[in-house]
């Protein structure tokens, strides 16, 4: 019996793990690689296995870095069952078509450039039809039930409180009359988060594949009450300022948490004057996800949410408005007074949030509240790092608004919470494989676990471990050297700079004269950066 790490090895995205046994192979997760790794390995479509040979796919949760390559897997020949919790299947029903739409848009944009340059046209990584084909293979399962995956393989999904429907998956493989339990943690959440249940540890594990996203970090806001109080105080201050309160938020998970808190504030009269403030959800995907969250039953809700849900729609209140169409979104920009605007994307890199930032950042009475991680280089990160002005949709915008950040909304367990989750597994696993983390986080968590007596492995991409003999194989591709990693990071950086350069040049062609000089300076800076990168 062997386990091969086909993704999220020494990186955070692209989770994909393969168990090979005498009866065949199964996959756990099939995620899309993002960020600097998006164009490496099978990020552009080459799997390190034959999709049609895979017996079944198990999904820990719906986030695209765990599911984003599922439509491509099906497109390339996989036709087996896809097992997930029922809530995960529902969320994938909106997230995979949305991802396909992005793939089609990217291909269309690339083909316009290729056509002008006389280059061959490209196909999207996968299409909406591919996404639809993959959704037909999903089989929703209940938490804590042991199910048959294929001959010789059983599994159980245990709630880990990261996202609606998220799970750790216990996989039992019987080979040669011996049953081995391999546990995949998925992404582990935090205690006392709203709506969903607290993380549960599995009842046992011979081998554990453990995420390490925040293996080197301790969250500054430790309790849900502290986070709730901080959010309430920011809303009080924002209402007192009199301008709009703009909240960039991830469409799935974070948007629903915000609505949950706002409804609690209204029910408990926590924030004076809040009942007079209109609340707008301006994210088509966020609206669909909210409906899924509202329709889930007791299997997913924590006890407090069950009580709140009995009084009616979990997220519905009189001052809530939704903006599904472009026209409805544009109308929000004409509003006066104080309004709460929740919009995607969470890092402000795309989507309707950019229009709301453009129309509010320059206003001294406005408030912008960040409730999620902002990656280096994103517009959100630039703003929270103290920029005095930013360029949005081709326009320089001075930042006069109050900028706030709440760190306690993280959906990932920190180092102490990861250690606690592992310690609650009754028997010590023979081996823990650390994945889904950058080197710094992995090494920090590895040290802490080794201090407690655990045997730790940090797999490289495509490494295969024989669980019977303990042998390690570098299969499918050679090990990636540090020099190769650096070249790939550099290539990704060049691609990103080139994309921004092309976008800026396109905007310059239609720019007003008073903006053209600023745009020319930006283009010159990007060109200088690219020249340094390619030397």
Go through each PLM region and give its residues:
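Core dinuclear metal-dependent hydrolase active-site scaffold
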Residues: 1-52, 133-197, 331-334, 340, ...
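A general structural motif
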Residues: 224-228, 318-328, 347-349, 384-389, ...
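Hard-cation-handling environments
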Residues: 234-378, 390-391, 426, 443, ...
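Pre-active-site segment of Zn-dependent metallo-hydrolases
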Residues: 9-14, 21-80, 84-138, 188-198, ...
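A polyampholytic, Gly/Pro-enriched intrinsically disordered region
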Residues: 103-108, 297-311, 391, 473-496
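Active-site metal-binding loops of divalent metal-dependent hydrolases
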Residues: 8-9, 30-33, 87, 163, ...
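Metallo-beta-lactamase
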Residues: 99-163, 298-335
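Cap/insert and terminal regions of metallo-dependent hydrolase folds
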Residues: 168, 189-282, 367-372, 390-459
């Amino acid at each position: 019996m062997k386990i091969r790490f086909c993704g999220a090895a020494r990186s955070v995205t692209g989770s994909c793990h393969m168990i090979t046994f005498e009866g065949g192979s199964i996959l756990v997760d099939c995620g899309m690689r993002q960020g600097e790794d998006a164009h490496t390995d099978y990020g552009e479509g080459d799997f390190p296995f034959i999709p049609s040979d895979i017996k079944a796919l198990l999904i820990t949760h719906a986030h695209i870095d765990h599911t984003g390559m599922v439509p491509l897997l099906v497109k390339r020949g996989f036709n087996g069952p896809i097992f997930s919790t029922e809530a995960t299947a529902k969320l994938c029903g909106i997230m995979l078509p949305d991802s396909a739409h992005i793939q089609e848009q990217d291909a269309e944009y690339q083909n316009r450039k290729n056509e002008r340059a006389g280059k061959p046209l490209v196909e999207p990584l996968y299409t909406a039809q591919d996404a639809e084909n993959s959704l037909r293979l999903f089989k929703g399962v209940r938490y804590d039930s042991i199910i048959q995956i294929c001959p010789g393989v059983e599994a159980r999904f245990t709630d880990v409180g990261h996202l609606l429907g998220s799970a750790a998956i216990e996989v039992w493989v019987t080979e040669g009359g011996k049953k081995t339990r391999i546990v995949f943690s998925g992404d582990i959440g935090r205690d006392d988060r709203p709506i969903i249940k607290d993380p549960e540890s599995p009842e046992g594990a011979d081998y554990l594949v453990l995420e390490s996203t925040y293996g080197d970090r301790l969250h500054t806001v430790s309790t849900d009450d502290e986070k709730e109080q901080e959010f309430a105080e920011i809303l009080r201050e924002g209402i007192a300022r009199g301008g709009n309160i703009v909240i960039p938020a991830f469409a799935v998970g974070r948007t629903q948490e915000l609505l949950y808190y706002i409804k609690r504030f209204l029910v408990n009269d926590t924030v004076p004057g809040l009942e007079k403030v209109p609340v707008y959800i301006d994210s088509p995907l966020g609206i669909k996800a909210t409906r899924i969250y509202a329709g889930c039953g007791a299997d997913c809700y924590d006890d407090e949410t069950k009580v709140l849900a009995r009084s009616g729609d979990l997220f519905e209140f009189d001052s809530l408005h939704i903006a599904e169409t472009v026209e409805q979104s544009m109308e929000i920009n004409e509003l006066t007074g104080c309004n709460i605007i929740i919009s995607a994307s969470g890092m402000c890199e795309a989507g309707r949030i950019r229009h709301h930032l453009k129309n509010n950042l320059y206003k001294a009475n406005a408030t912008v509240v960040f409730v999620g991680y902002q990656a280096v280089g994103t517009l959100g990160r630039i703003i929270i790092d103290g920029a005095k002005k930013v360029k949005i949709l081709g326009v320089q915008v001075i930042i006069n608004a109050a900028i706030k950040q709440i760190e306690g909304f993280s959906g990932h367990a920190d180092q102490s919470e990861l250690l606690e989750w592992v310690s609650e597994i009754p028997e010590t696993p023979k081996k823990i494989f650390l994945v889904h983390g950058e080197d710094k986080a992995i090494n920090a968590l590895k040290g802490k676990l080794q201090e407690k007596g655990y045997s730790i492995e940090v797999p490289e991409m495509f490494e295969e471990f024989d669980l019977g003999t303990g042998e390690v194989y570098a299969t499918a591709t050679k090990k990636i050297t540090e020099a190769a990693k650096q070249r790939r990071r550099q290539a990704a950086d060049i691609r990103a700079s080139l994309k921004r350069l092309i976008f800026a040049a396109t905007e310059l062609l239609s720019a007003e004269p008073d903006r053209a000089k600023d745009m020319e300076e930006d283009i010159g800076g990007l060109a200088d950066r690219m020249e340094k990168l390619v030397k």
